[in-house]
A protein has these predicted regions:
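Catalytic-core regions of core metabolic enzymes
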Residues: 3-474
Length: 474
């Protein structure tokens, strides 16, 4: 007999779902959008249908009991009337209709569903949500939601009802992000896209009536396309947090967690949002730290941590070397490093002399080389390369932060690639700060194309180092 656990909404739930096959949900070849409107062109279901039809390599069918035509395509009166079975059903109807539709999906041999609709446990409809979960579990039918945005897999599927022109989406990459909140997921996806961090998968699980974080963690741990697994978590059912931490500890990939509900006010907000039990945050946070699971304190940390760990998986001690053309930026970086438990070893006179000997004549007499290394605004590509070579060889350092201000007149757009190759040759992790403006794009891409994460802020760069230090050994 399987154990049960009791969430804050008072419903009994099995502590573990069976081993779901998520392939049809995340890489469907055929999709049905149930609940399209023949009256409102911008109805959420219509947006989803049209976007999938125009942008993704799947066959998509529109379903509405009234039939008709939508965007020049036939509208079918029911899931059972489609010309062939579908892998994924996207359900966007009023809550009271979802149970019957779910039954029809099961009878029609649909592979799984994402239930976009709200109006369940988050507004007190506990009974209806439990009926959905019981029916699906009885038939081995996986669904995401309800009360969610659903699934985004670059190049495969996008069930978000947000038009493509209103939201920047990440390109394909190594990071998977699972979020209880659709809004948080959208916000983070935009930030990831802006920083050039690619996604393998984004999932909004909403009320997580059936498929939960633990199920997706197990799937993503085995997914060859995913290198880093991140979660935004509002709460767990009783006992579920313990199981999640144990699974995350055993996961062979970096796991990053951003948890809300840290305060009593936050716990109330969580309960009204997705009907989750926030639990004791201090206990959960301590468990993450004990087992080497990276915790992000805020959204900036989540993005920074994912960016760093998608490039560097092995943990470090946190001994940082800093190279920059501006003493002020170096001082700011040192302060931030100190606040986050990172050390900045100082170079002795002998070490400084060796570095100085390799600098250009215009920089030799004015550079400060104690760590941070301040090459001044007169530095050339060669000066940065020489300094990076010395730091990359140093056994006293295990990571380098480059703070680049591209207005320095003597540096070129090739510097990012050249510095990346120096550090790669010595197997030394490199993190870069470059302001994210279009005129610096070639410089930034020189880093990114060579597997070096780039932050648009000094704090973000330091947080990337913090993530590598806090990661559990692979």
């Amino acid at each position: 007999m399987q154990d049960t656990c009791v969430p804050s909404n008072g419903l009994l739930m099995k502590s573990r779902s069976p081993g779901w096959d998520f392939k049809q949900l995340f890489q469907p070849k055929t999709v049905a959008v149930i609940g399209v409107s023949l009256k409102r062109e911008r109805h959420p279901a219509n947006v989803i249908f049209n976007k999938i039809h125009l942008r993704y390599p799947v066959d998509v069918f529109a379903v509405n009991p009234g039939g008709g035509e939508l965007f020049g395509r036939k509208v079918y009166t029911g899931i059972k009337n489609l010309p062939r079975p579908v892998d994924l059903a996207i359900i966007a109807v009023r809550a009271e209709y979802t149970l019957d539709i779910l039954k029809d999906c099961i009878d029609a041999g649909v592979g799984g569903a994402t239930i976009i609709s709200g109006g369940f446990a988050e507004v007190g409809r506990l009974d209806l949500q439990q009926q959905l979960a019981d029916l699906a579990r009885q038939h081995g039918f996986p669904f995401i939601g309800p009360n969610c945005l659903g699934i985004y897999v670059p190049g495969h599927i996008d069930t978000f009802f947000i038009p493509s022109e209103r939201m920047i989406r990440p390109e394909s990459g190594k990071v998977a992000l699972v979020s209880q909140s659709g809004g948080v997921l959208v916000d983070q996806m935009t930030k990831f896209a802006e920083q050039g961090i690619g996604f393998s998968l984004g999932v909004s699980i909403g009320n997580k009536a059936l498929v939960r974080e633990l199920d997706l963690l197990e799937y993503l741990a085995a997914d060859p396309g995913t290198g880093v697994i991140a979660f935004y978590i509002e709460g767990f059912a009783r006992g579920e947090g313990r199981d999640f931490v144990q699974a995350a500890r055993q996961c062979p990939k970096p796991v990053i967690v951003l948890k809300s509900g840290k305060t009593s006010e936050g716990m109330r907000a969580v309960s009204s949002h997705t009907a989750s039990m926030a639990g004791d945050y201090a206990v959960f946070s301590a468990a993450l730290a004990q087992h080497g699971i990276v915790e992000a304190i805020n959204e900036l940390e989540l993005v920074s941590f994912c960016g760093a760990l998608s490039c560097y998986g092995e943990p470090i001690e946190g001994r940082v070397g800093i190279i920059n053309p501006s003493g002020g930026h170096g001082a700011l970086a040192v302060d931030i490093c100190s606040r986050h438990g990172l050390s900045i070893p100082a170079f002795n006179q002998e070490q400084q002399s060796k570095i100085r000997a390799d600098l250009s004549s215009s920089v030799q007499s004015i550079a400060s080389l104690t760590n941070p290394i301040d090459l001044t605004g007169s530095a050339t590509d060669g000066d940065f390369m020489a300094a990076a070579e010395h730091l990359a060889r140093s056994p006293e350092l295990d990571v380098i932060i480059i703070l680049l201000l591209p207005y320095t007149p003597e540096i070129t757009s090739d510097l990012g690639a050249r510095l990346s190759l120096v550090c790669r040759r010595h197997n030394k992790p490199l993190i870069a700060y470059v302001p994210h403006v279009e005129r610096y794009r070639m410089l930034i891409e020189g880093f990114e194309f060579n597997g070096v994460p780039v932050s648009p802020s000094i704090k973000g760069a330091v947080l990337m180092v913090k993530a590598i230090k806090g990661n559990k050994p692979c």
